[in-house]
Amino acid sequence: MSKYGVMRGLHFQRPPYAQSKLVRCVKGKVIDVAVDIRKGSPTYGQHVAVLLTEENHRQFFIPQGFAHGFAVLSESAVFQYKCDNFYHPEADGGISILDESLGIDWGLAMEEALLSEKDTKHPKLAEFDSPFVWNQEPGAKNQD
């Protein structure tokens, strides 16, 4: 369970342990975000943000090659994740959730944000060398 103001991300796993995720909020309300980090992608650095609540029952799919993050907008929130690969700490990576160049509206003031020490150390997108490469062929995996 996470409380109001908790922000996590923007996380991904490097190949060969890359993950796709299907997420939903089973209690509370969150803004959930995916950022395209595939080199060469026409949407590189762009994001999609979705409001997930226990009332709207929406799910959000984050494919491999996208960084994932969220902010809790209710008193508390509980997530449910489905992943297509196991967690591998040695493959853990991230982009700064505070990178203003991404233009993400997190729905709360940064003074209210509660970040883990780990999440304050991720590089900004401009300083990041992505391990993912965009492949425009249908059905192709988007990684090196």
Language-model segment annotations:
Residues 1-58, 74-76, 83, 88-140, ...:
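Non-catalytic, conserved peripheral segments adjacent to functional cores
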Residues 69:
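Short alpha-helical functional segments enriched in proximate histidine and acidic residues
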